[in-house]
């Protein structure tokens, strides 16, 4: 016959086993029963280069990949994101997950007003946006809040000023063509897994360079991108399309340095294990300006 203490111990053990079983069922239920809210996607592009082409008519682009695990790049990306995320529009957005973002700013349409948008790669997960009204535009659902809007069923998802968002929908749907010139430059960039990138076009690109004796714009396209090399260290690409007789030349600014030219488009590929050196590295350039020689006729007899 079992003693009272043994009976009590058996009951406690049975209770513990029952709790473990219930806990296992709950864990299984949460793992298998919960799914991230998803959305329908009507138009979609994948890959950085194809995404950049959709906003190739903008004047300034930033690309930030939040999936990088490199601490140096994470710090650089966080610094840019901290600045961008101060925008008032983020009062109206809530994400379930974000892989990367492209920020595109367009030339001003009036004094002090620059249309802009954020493209968020969220896969098929849902983005929550506080809105006052909703409308259909070329088969895409637009949610509107004052001067801000979100194109919901596209990927990357677009959030920004309404005019910029509608321009993006026009492009991703094929209604509007991309900027062929800048899209062609983007196509020629080395196919790396960029984690951070900056693109400037038109006058925004030309403002970063000044040369004595030059007349008119020097460049109309600037790209700078950084990637983590699989074998260690970092790769950096800088590309510029020159409007005058300017070109990249050989240099030893990094451990590895190479220049490729496609007509006036100059591309410098750099590699180094020193992150600070990679971040600050710029290609060396040469300029050739031909000046007319004034003819000295002297005195005629």
Give the residues covered by each predicted segment:
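Secretory targeting signatures
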Residues: 1-39, 157, 301
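Structural boundary/hinge residues at secondary-structure and domain interfaces
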Residues: 28-131, 136, 187-205, 260-301
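Secondary-structure transition/turn motif
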Residues: 122-123, 145-147, 161-164, 239-244, ...
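Surface-exposed flexible segments
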Residues: 126-137, 163-174, 241-256
């Amino acid at each position: 016959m079992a003693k009272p203490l043994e009976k009590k111990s058996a009951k406690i053990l049975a209770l513990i086993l029952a709790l473990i079983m219930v806990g296992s069922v709950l864990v299984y239920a949460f793992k298998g029963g919960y799914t991230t809210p998803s959305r329908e996607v009507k138009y979609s592009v994948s890959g950085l280069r194809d995404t950049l082409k959709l906003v190739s008519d903008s004047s300034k682009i930033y690309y930030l990949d939040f999936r990088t695990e490199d601490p140096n790049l994470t710090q650089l990306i966080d610094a840019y994101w901290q600045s961008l995320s101060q925008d008032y529009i983020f009062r109206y957005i809530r994400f379930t997950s974000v892989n990367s973002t492209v920020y595109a700013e367009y030339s001003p349409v009036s004094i002090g007003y620059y249309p802009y948008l954020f493209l968020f790669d969220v896969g098929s997960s849902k983005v929550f946006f506080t809105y006052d009204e909703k409308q259909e535009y070329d088969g895409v659902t637009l949610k509107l809040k004052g001067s801000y809007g979100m194109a919901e069923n596209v990927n990357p998802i677009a959030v920004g000023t309404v005019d910029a968002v509608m321009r993006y929908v026009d492009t991703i749907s094929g209604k509007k063509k991309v900027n062929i010139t800048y899209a062609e430059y983007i196509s020629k960039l080395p196919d790396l897994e960029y984690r951070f990138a900056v693109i400037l076009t038109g006058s925004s690109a030309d403002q970063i360079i000044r040369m004595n004796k030059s007349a008119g714009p020097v460049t109309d396209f600037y790209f700078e991108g950084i990637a983590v090399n699989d074998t260690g260290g970092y790769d950096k690409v800088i590309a510029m399309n020159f409007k005058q007789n300017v070109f990249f030349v050989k240099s030893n600014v990094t451990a590895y340095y190479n220049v490729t030219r496609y007509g006036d488009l100059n591309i410098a590929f750099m590699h180094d294990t020193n992150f600070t050196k990679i971040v600050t590295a710029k290609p060396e350039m040469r300029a050739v300006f031909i000046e007319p020689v004034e003819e000295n006729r002297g005195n005629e007899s």
